[in-house]
Amino acid sequence: MKKIINNPQNVVSEMIDGFTQSSRDLLKLKGNFNVVVRSDYSQIKDRVTLISGGGSGHEPAHIGYIGNAMLTGAVCGDVFASPSAKQIFMAIKSVAGKMGCILIVKNYMGDNGSFSIAREMCKSQLPDIRVEIITVDDDISSILMKLNEFSNDNNDNIQDIRDKYKSITNRRGIAGTVLVHKILGGLAEQGKSIDEILKFYNKYISPSKSLNLVTMGVGLSSCIIPSVGSPSFTLNEKEMEIGLGIHGEFGIEKVELKPSKQIIKSLIDNLLKILPYSNNNNNNNNNNNNNNNNNNNNNNNSCGISCGSDGEDKSLIVLINNLGSTTNMEMAIATNDCLNYLHEKGFTVERLITGTLMTSLEMAGISISLLLIKNNQIINLIDLKTNAMGWPNSVLKPYKNKEDSILTLDENDSHEIKYDNLKSITISKENGEILKEIVLLGCNSLIENSNKLTDLDKQVGDGDLGTTLENLSKSIKKSIDTIPFDKPCYTFRKISLIIQELIGGSSGLFYSIFFLRLSNSLYERSTVNGKNQISTNDWGLSLIDAVNAIKELGKADIGDCTMLDSLIPAINKINQCCKDNENSSSSFDLLNTLKLASKEAQLGSESTIEMIAKKGRSSYLGERTSHIMDPGAHAIEIIFKSFLSIKK
């Protein structure tokens, strides 16, 4: 077990101290109660107070949701363990006033028991304070399994499923609880009475009474309770748990790991089996909306709040929750797939909340919560500003269509037009074929040695060099027949552009600028005094210029344990051969030149074995890079060695 903690037995109290010491908006109740409240609690006793809590390990829940327009206080049990009734009672006693107190409880036996006992204690010890409990039970997975409806694509009996679902009471409370905090917290902030808040919740939010709030999750790993020191279950690299809770327990089914699109589709398809939206056509929807508007006064009277017209039947609040250690990259991909699929199903996502909101310690995975907007006041309540540290600063308003999120620039071919000058410099068709073969040999060698370069890079870098150079090579090969190799200045510019489109880390940058400078230098040298012809000497000097471009960009030189330790001696040898040939009457011996350059590249690559890296990511490792050949230098050696297979 690796965790940044002190004593496993003190993690909760020390965590609370971390929260409260870092924010003047929070106070910790003195004593061993693990209770945290708003620092302005004494000024808001004329409003309904909201208290939530449960086991720790779900942070930022629930301390992170204490603040204006959210919770008044929170009670923390041990990790994944319910707080005691006494702790909860002390929280109520600390902050509740004449307007009463609502306890927001996730539907677990321990939490229900402790909060219910605390409420009962208040009847005799705090008789002037009305205390009510609402239970959040938004998780649908275990019920679908009991109804044998999980992964069943037959939707003919949807209403029957919903009726049975509503009658079953042992659903878990998970990430949808965060939306309950926000909406009810907003109502309390507006000064609504306890009855008004309860009626609004039961009519528009309650998972068990309205079915409007549903959640389902998927886990890619378990988690480790500090006091236990080992995971509660294990998953191999190709497995995932569907429909799990937030306490490190198994899901309802262990399945093969799927791509994000399939995971999201499975979660949403199951959520929509319960969510009471209508599949009616637009005319029916309009009729329903008219009926809803006509009955709006009845709706307002039923909840006691003037809350505006009922929302459209397929408008949603979507909450995508990080269960603990899912990367932001994965979260963004899942968000994209979620929005695309909901749009495909005809839903409008009015608000999107994403982030680490209700965790299961360090579990990898996500959950998706859908709240059907049956009243537009819900949107206003979600939008209310809060200083609660766990609520995202930005509640997002997604585009209704993906196309609306794309910036389209006017297309023109001006970038091709300005390259016409580069195309004016030509070599013979035969030499163009030789150049093409050289490029192909280099690309093929990098593709064939991808794994070797990756393994080498893992020892001193981030392990992506082999894959990067393989991808660049494949992209060049894909365009190989569209490149006019008898026009070398344009050819090298084209190769640079291909690499730029993929880039692939710093190595991609260096290869791109090499070919870009080679193109520019060849053109400038071949057009001096209007000769418009490339000499042998121009080739050598232009290659030197291209190497200098890498030196300038990387601020490196020979001896720094980089690709330059192999590239510089190889290019220097080519340049020397070009100079020697310029003063000779014999034809240029390309194969012999490449043999000499290849030998220099090999010696340069081998020289890095005894070096300590001074540049690049490897430089952060210091002496740990010693006795390991630099992967960038070895890639240059591989490229030059491939040139020896030239047939022309």
From Swiss-Prot:
Instruction: List, for all copies, the residue spans of the domain called DhaL.
Output: 433-645
| A cellular component term, taken from the record's GO annotations | cytosol
Q: Which residues form the DhaK domain?
A: 7-391
Catalytic activities: dihydroxyacetone + ATP = dihydroxyacetone phosphate + ADP + H(+); D-glyceraldehyde + ATP = D-glyceraldehyde 3-phosphate + ADP + H(+)
Q: Which domain of life is it from?
A: Eukaryota
Alphabetical GO biological process terms: glycerol catabolic process
- EC number, UniProt record: 2.7.1.28, 2.7.1.29
Q: Write out the catalytic residues in the record.
A: 247 (tele-hemiaminal-histidine intermediate)
Q: Which GO terms describe its molecular function?
A: ATP binding; glycerone kinase activity; lyase activity; triokinase activity
One matching Pfam family: Dak1
Could you say which residues bind ATP here? Answer: 462-465, 506-507, 554, 562-563, 630-632
Protein name, entry field = Probable dihydroxyacetone kinase
Organism whose genome encodes this protein: Dictyostelium discoideum
